[in-house]
Curated annotation (Swiss-Prot):
Keywords: 4Fe-4S, Cytoplasm, Iron, Iron-sulfur, Metal-binding, S-adenosyl-L-methionine, Transferase. Its cofactor is [4Fe-4S] cluster. The lineage of its organism: Bacteria, Pseudomonadati, Pseudomonadota, Gammaproteobacteria, Enterobacterales. GO terms for molecular function: 4 iron, 4 sulfur cluster binding; lipoate synthase activity; metal ion binding. This is Lipoyl synthase.
Length: 321
C-alpha cells in the first residue's frame, strides 16, 4: 500500500498525485481504452511561434501565470499567436482537485500583494484592449480571493482606462456575501462563472462544488448589475446527454445569464476523467440554435470553444466556434 501524500505548502500536485487526493476516485485510463479523436478535433499549429514565446517570456519575467498554460488549453498556440491570453491570478495552486482539470492542486502560498501592479503593467505593455482575469480556487482565504480580483481590476483600469475586463471567478464557496460585496464595488465589464457540466455528474466532475450555489452566484451578481453581461460555460463529453445540457441552459437563463460557451472536454492525462463521447460540430450548432431561441445574447458553441476563447469577439456578439 502506498503512503498517503502529505501536502507541503507551495508544492504543485498533478496527475496521479492530485487524483490520489480526491475522495471520488477515477480509474486510470489504459491507452487501448482511449477514444480516438475524430478529424474535427485535429489542431493545426501556427508556423511562426515567435509571438507565443514572447508572451510566455513576458509572463515569466513578471512572475505571472496564464490559465492557457496551467490548464493545458488546446487553443494556447492560436490565442498566444494572436497576442491574447487569460491571466490566472492568486498563484498556480488550486485548493480544489477537480478530476477534469489540469491545474495543480495543493496548499497555496500567500497571495502576492504586488501581483495587481505587475499584471496591470504587463497588460499595458502588451497594449491589450480586452483581457480575461481568472484564478485558482482559494478556499484558504476569508473572501475566496475577491479583494485580490478587485485590486487587479482597479490596477488594470488605472494603467489602461479604455480596456474591457472580463472576470472568470470561482464559486466563493461559503463566502458569497463577502465576495459579492467586494466585487459589486469594483465590477468587471463581463462577469463569468462556469457551471462546467450537468448536476447529475457534479459529484464526480466537480467535487466540492454545488450546482445551485453556482447558479445563485450568477443570479445575485446580475441582480446587482443588470447592465453587465453574465456568462457561463460547460464542457461536453463527461457522461451528460444533450437533453441535460439544454436543461442547464434553461437554468442559466432563469438565473439571468446572457452569454454561453459550450466546448468539448479533452482528457489532460490518463489519470483524469476519460472522454465519454465526442460531440460533432453539427450537434454544437443545434445547441447554439437552442440557446439563441432561449434568449441568450451570445452563444459560442464548438469543439474547441473554451470560456475565454476569443472572449473579445464573444463580448461583441461575433461568431465564435
Amino acid at each position: 500500500m502506498s503512503k498517503p501524500i502529505v501536502m507541503e505548502r507551495g508544492v504543485k500536485y498533478r496527475d496521479a498525485d492530485k487524483m490520489a487526493l480526491i475522495p471520488v476516485k477515477t480509474v486510470v485510463t489504459e491507452r487501448t481504452e482511449v477514444l480516438r479523436k475524430p478529424e474535427w478535433m485535429k489542431i493545426k499549429l501556427p508556423a511562426d511561434s515567435s509571438r507565443i514565446q514572447g508572451i510566455k517570456a513576458a509572463m515569466r519575467k513578471n512572475g505571472l501565470h496564464s490559465v492557457c498554460e496551467e490548464a493545458s488549453c488546446p487553443n494556447l498556440a492560436e490565442c498566444f499567436n494572436h497576442g491574447t491570453a487569460t491571466f490566472m491570478i492568486l498563484g498556480a495552486i488550486c485548493t480544489r482537485r477537480c478530476p477534469f482539470c489540469d491545474v495543480a492542486h495543493g496548499r497555496p502560498t500567500t497571495p502576492d500583494a504586488n501581483e495587481p501592479g505587475k499584471l496591470a503593467q504587463t497588460i499595458a505593455d502588451m497594449a491589450l484592449r480586452y483581457v480575461v482575469i481568472t484564478s485558482v480556487d482559494r478556499d484558504d482565504l476569508r473572501d475566496g480571493g475577491a479583494q485580490h480580483f478587485a485590486d487587479c481590476i482597479s490596477a488594470i483600469r488605472e494603467k489602461s482606462p479604455t480596456i474591457k475586463i472580463e472576470t472568470l471567478v470561482p464559486d466563493f464557496r461559503g463566502r458569497m456575501d463577502r465576495a459579492l460585496e467586494i466585487l459589486n464595488a469594483t465590477p468587471p465589464d463581463v462577469f463569468n462563472h462556469n457551471l462546467e457540466n450537468v448536476p447529475r455528474v457534479y459529484r464526480q466532475v466537480r467535487p466540492g462544488a454545488n450546482y445551485d450555489w453556482s447558479l445563485k452566484l450568477l443570479e445575485r451578481f446580475k441582480e446587482a448589475h443588470p447592465e453587465i453581461p453574465t456568462k457561463s460555460g460547460l464542457m461536453v463529453g463527461l457522461g451528460e446527454t444533450n437533453a441535460e445540457i439544454v436543461e442547464v441552459m434553461r437554468d442559466l437563463r432563469r438565473h439571468g445569464v446572457t452569454m454561453l460557451t459550450l466546448g468539448q472536454y479533452l482528457q489532460p492525462s490518463r489519470h483524469h476523467l476519460p472522454v465519454q463521447r465526442y460531440v460533432s460540430p453539427a450537434e454544437f450548432d443545434e445547441m447554439k440554435a437552442a440557446a439563441m431561441d432561449m434568449g441568450f445574447t451570445h452563444a459560442a458553441c464548438g469543439p474547441f470553444v473554451r470560456s475565454s476563447y476569443h472572449a473579445d469577439m464573444q463580448a461583441k456578439g461575433l461568431e465564435v466556434k
